[in-house]
């Protein structure tokens, strides 16, 4: 029987006959004691070519026998161990990597057909067995070179960073089909978000057009499931056709905020002006995506979201009626914490953007599952929950995205409990993930946060902690928002130091650093800060007006005088009049605003005085 610790292709295969080990100290110790190299397979439950490799190369009797005799085979699920994937991925999935017993890379590829695999396996084995000392010494040399390359210098933040990255987004925009680059076409949601952010900064219609056209071609094209709703992972052609049909919770969670932001900017009209009459608009595509997630990817009993639905080209080409008669693609019912946190944030944003309060309730319920079932009180958030319990501690992304979702919940619901939980996670991030050598732990000039905590696994490349610009960008957002919510200067300094750590590296990333650009600009140009004083019931209209402000960025919270007296005092806000909103940009604050319709104009006037123009395109 197949080992249930591993997921193999749902179609007939013999991959389970390979004596797979989990990623562990024991597996590498076995390799060292036996003198055998390691075969590392990085796979994913949704990955079509991973399934093909299970059915072909890993089902070949000769391949199975040779691997079991001459290698220590280790199988890792990409979604469960993104830290391993970040260090060993060879350019896609499946990844087929050959390692020394110390965990350094000998050779690697992605999908390897059976005939090539039969040639490759003995070549790698002979090379390693014949050159062990040379291979080991070279591995040590490569590790030292890698560590030197990772120790980049910090730099000063300046408006040029935002301008450089926005220019890269614009230069890589595809004017024919939208999106960025040619083929394959990925959504690049951070780049779309930066276009919409920059448009709200300077009202350049070209920036809005690029975002609208990208989302329009995606929503009306093959990369959107026109029958069920929801987006496939990417398209293999420039015109968004011939998609890879896996549906990922993560990808849909990232695309939904793009659609919601565009819906607000265009007042829920169609992404492009060419649509008219009964053609669906941006709200329709957002609604249909949420409906798909509710239908197929949410656990109705426990409240969390599933990880993905498998790719099956023939199934997704069927009509609704045809799909009802066919076997449905596999759904990975694992709860991945960071992806759940992303979708929770999207649900909370949609609850007021689309006026769907049931999405707020569902988002809060999922957030409670993460906090209650996927967290250790002393050791932070786990990576995933597979039904048997939470698994894998110590990854930065899960802490950062959960903290962000908690701040989103605080902003949308007004409940201070979420703010306190976010502060708790933020303290844990500083304590366990900060680059201590550069002072992040004490709030000094730091080099950001590592992707894994300080309880490092002494296995392979996991011995060397890395810094992800994406995860650090989320951390910077969390600390910057905490600063505006609490007026604690230390949080702002941590955010600044985190962003400074990537000043020397961002030029090499181009538009892939779009999320970083937004947070740099938000730090240099203060967001609209709106504190609403009054009970949730009395302040509801002011709260809604604050959430809907048409500004590049804003921080909103509701403070109930009966519950939040200490915080009102810390923020130097009076308990009366109530309800009333106080809008601030930096040190400039408004008089109390008591009429919801007056809040937008008050903020607009203050914004004009506070924010510099974005770079022209």
PLM regions with names:
Residues 2-14, 41-43, 48, 52-64, ...:
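Glycan-recognition and catalytic cores of secretory/periplasmic carbohydrate-active enzymes
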Residues 73-76:
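Conserved alpha/beta-hydrolase
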Residues 1-34:
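N-terminal leader/targeting and pre-domain segments
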């Amino acid at each position: 029987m197949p080992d249930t610790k591993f997921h193999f292709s749902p179609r007939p295969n013999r991959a389970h006959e390979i004596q797979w080990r989990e990623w562990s100290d024991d597996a590498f110790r076995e390799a060292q004691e036996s003198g055998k190299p390691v075969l590392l397979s990085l796979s994913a439950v949704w990955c079509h070519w991973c399934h093909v490799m299970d059915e072909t190369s890993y089902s070949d009797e000769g391949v199975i026998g040779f691997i079991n005799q001459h290698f220590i085979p280790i199988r890792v699920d990409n979604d469960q161990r993104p830290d391993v994937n970040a260090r060993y991925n060879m350019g896609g999935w499946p990844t087929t990597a050959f390692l020394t017993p110390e965990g350094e890379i000998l050779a690697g590829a992605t999908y390897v057909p059976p005939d090539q695999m039969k040639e490759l396996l003995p070549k790698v084995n002979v090379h390693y067995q014949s050159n062990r000392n040379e291979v080991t010494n070279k591995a040590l040399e490569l590790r030292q070179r890698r560590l030197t390359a990772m120790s980049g210098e910090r730099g000063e933040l300046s408006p040029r960073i935002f301008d450089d990255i926005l220019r890269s987004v614009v230069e890589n925009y595809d004017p024919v089909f939208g999106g960025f680059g040619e083929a394959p076409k990925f959504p690049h949601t951070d780049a779309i978000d930066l276009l919409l952010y920059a448009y709200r900064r300077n009202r350049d219609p070209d920036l809005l057009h690029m975002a609208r056209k990208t989302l329009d071609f995606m929503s009306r094209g093959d990369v959107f499931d026109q029958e069920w709703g929801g987006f496939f992972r990417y398209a293999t052609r420039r015109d968004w056709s011939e998609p890879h049909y896996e549906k990922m919770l993560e990808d849909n969670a990232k695309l939904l905020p793009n659609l919601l932001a565009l819906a607000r900017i265009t007042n829920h009209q169609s992404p492009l002006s060419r649509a008219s009459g009964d053609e669906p608009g941006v709200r329709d595509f957002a609604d249909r995506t949420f409906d798909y997630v509710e239908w197929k990817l949410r656990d109705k009993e426990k409240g969390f979201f599933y990880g993905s639905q498998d790719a099956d080209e023939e199934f997704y080409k069927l009509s609704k009626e045809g799909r009802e008669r066919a076997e449905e693609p596999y759904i990975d019912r694992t709860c991945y914490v960071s992806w759940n946190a992303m979708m929770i944030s999207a649900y909370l944003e949609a609850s007021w953007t689309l006026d769907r309060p049931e999405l707020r309730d569902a988002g809060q319920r999922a957030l409670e599952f993460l906090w209650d079932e996927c967290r250790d009180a002393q050791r932070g958030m786990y990576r995933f929950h597979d039904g048997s319990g939470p698994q894998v501690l110590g990854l930065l992304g899960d802490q950062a995205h959960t903290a962000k979702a908690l701040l989103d919940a605080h902003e949308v619901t007004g409940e201070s409990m979420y703010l306190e939980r976010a502060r708790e996670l933020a303290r844990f991030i500083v304590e366990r993930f900060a680059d201590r050598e550069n002072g992040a732990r004490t709030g000094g000039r730091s080099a950001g946060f590592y992707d894994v905590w300080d309880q490092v696994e002494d296995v392979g490349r996991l011995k060397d902690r890395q810094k992800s610009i994406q995860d650090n960008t989320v951390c910077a957002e969390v600390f910057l928002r905490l600063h505006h919510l609490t007026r604690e200067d230390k949080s702002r300094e941590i955010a600044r130091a985190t962003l400074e750590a990537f000043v020397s590296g961002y030029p090499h990333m181009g538009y892939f650093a779009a999320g970083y650009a937004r947070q740099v600009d938000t730090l240099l140009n203060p967001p609209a800060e709106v504190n609403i004083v009054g009970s949730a019931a009395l302040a509801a209209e002011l709260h809604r007006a604050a959430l809907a402000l048409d500004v590049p960025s804003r921080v909103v919270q509701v403070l109930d005088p009966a519950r939040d007296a200490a915080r009102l005092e810390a923020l130097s806000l009076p308990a009366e009049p109530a309800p009333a909103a106080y809008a601030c940009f930096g040190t400039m604050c408004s008089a109390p605003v008591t009429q919801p319709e007056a809040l937008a104009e008050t903020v607009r006037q203050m914004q004009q005085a506070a924010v510099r123009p974005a770079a022209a395109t």
